[in-house]
Regions:
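Pyridoxal 5′-phosphate
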Residues: 1-414
Length: 414
């Protein structure tokens, strides 16, 4: 299948790389080639400095004090919420809930909406490509409520076909939970079309944007999803911060996932009433500095240019497809049109862990294992693969280094 590389204009990747201090280090005496962005991305100096400044100059708990530091921290925290709102083009900051991760965000919907709304025989449609974080919470509902999971397939190229998805929908379908972009294959799912079809049938849709939000602009109003989740550490921000976007009506339907401070309106000896969203879903002290750091990470992505990032990564993906095809005995899993910058692969006869360890000695960081996507790997008949995932700072020279190291690994185990 031909995938011509799109032209990339005015993208200075070397200037971008200088913003990430860790990229200047060496590993085993070799320059670091970091290709594990699908697991977690590196942080620009802006984010590192922001986190240090917040702890050094304006740290206090938020929404709980009238003193100077509390007001400063609250203002910075809520400014981060506004930055997330703009990043997703959400209608209001009240649609933006801070969590600790995408995983917690999905569980918030599963427990807050799925548990009270779904019952015996109701169906939840997910795809075979889902990360375990978008599988296991729905299994909880299957086990406790008697709901059923229905799996939308992919073809042998890892492509997602809308006509196959529609066949999964029945009068018992009560929820759709779907990835925006596969973390193992890079397949991009037509979530806007899915939401259009779902809307006609009155089915709510959760989109897992843990990968999608990193690699393409996202407009939740245009997609028209009911919920959208993403995680900060993949967006070049700190770990420990995630985001749940929810439509106003859906958030008001949901019961709180956790109880504690801030999420209440009133507590008495015999009853409790809950705060309005988003605070209803932010029990306890939130990830304050992590949220502030995420806001500045999104600022950084906007500065570089989200369309420019997408074009750079598309060009890199096309080049990687070409270079990896030159490695003898290497099989790439997933070649869907328009795929994102993720490559899962194996070298015939060599375990993924062994390949990863050998190329690590060349300074190259990839992931080896199941990528928290065991049903997908089973569908392709493998138990583990290596995964190279590219970000806004990766280069063609690093793709060359990967291809050369893989050829060396193949010969090493021959």
């Amino acid at each position: 299948m031909e995938h011509p590389a799109p032209p990339v204009a005015a993208y200075d990747v070397e200037a971008v790389r200088k913003d990430f201090p860790i990229l200047s280090r060496t590993v085993y005496g070799k320059p670091l080639v970091y290709l594990d962005n699908g697991a977690s991305a590196q942080k620009p100096q802006l984010v590192i400095d922001t986190v240090a400044h917040a702890y050094s100059n304006e740290y206090a708990n938020v929404h709980r004090g009238l003193h100077f530091l509390s007001n400063a921290a609250t203002e910075a925290y809520e400014q981060a919420r506004e930055k997330v709102r703009r990043f997703l083009n959400a209608p209001s900051v009240d649609n933006i809930i801070f969590t600790k991760s995408s995983t917690e965000a999905i569980n918030t919907v599963a427990y807050g909406y799925g548990m009270p709304k779904l019952g015996e025989g109701d169906e939840i449609v997910i795809s075979i490509m889902e990360h375990h974080s978008n599988i296991v919470p729905w299994h909880f509902i299957r086990e406790r409520q008697g709901a059923k999971l229905v799996w939308a397939p992919v073809d042998d190229d890892g492509a997602f076909h809308i006509e196959d998805f529609v066949k999964c929908l029945t009068e018992r379908t009560k929820l759709i939970a779907i990835t925006h972009m596969s973390n193992a294959l890079g397949t991009v799912v037509p979530v806007k079309e899915i939401c259009r079809i779902a809307r006609e049938r009155g089915i709510p849709v959760l989109v897992d944007g843990s990968q999608g939000a990193v690699h393409m602009p996202v407009d939740v109003q245009d997609i028209d999803c009911d919920w959208y989740v993403m995680t900060g550490h993949k967006l070049y921000g700190p770990s420990g911060i995630g985001v749940l976007y929810g439509k106003t009506g859906r958030l008001k339907e949901m019961r709180p996932f956790m109880g504690g401070g801030e999420m209440i309106e009133e507590v008495t000896e015999d009853r409790v009433t809950y705060n309005d969203p988003p605070h209803r879903f932010e029990a306890g002290t939130p990830p304050i500095v992590q949220a502030i750091g995420l806001g500045y990470a999104l600022d950084y992505m906007e500065k570089v240019g989200r369309e420019a990032i997408r074009a750079h990564e598309a060009s890199l993906t096309a080049y990687a497809r070409e270079r990896l095809s030159s490695v003898n005995s290497l099989r790439v899993f997933g070649d869907a049109p328009g795929k994102g910058s993720i490559f899962s692969f194996e070298i015939a006869g060599i375990h993924a862990h062994d390949v990863s360890m050998v190329i690590d000695r060349a300074g190259i960081a990839v992931r080896a294992g199941t990528h928290c996507a065991q049903p997908l790997l089973k569908r392709f008949g493998v138990t583990s693969t290596c995964r190279a995932s590219f970000g806004l700072y990766n280069t063609r020279a690093e793709v060359d280094a990967l291809a050369d190291a893989l050829e060396h690994a193949r010969k090493f185990f021959a």
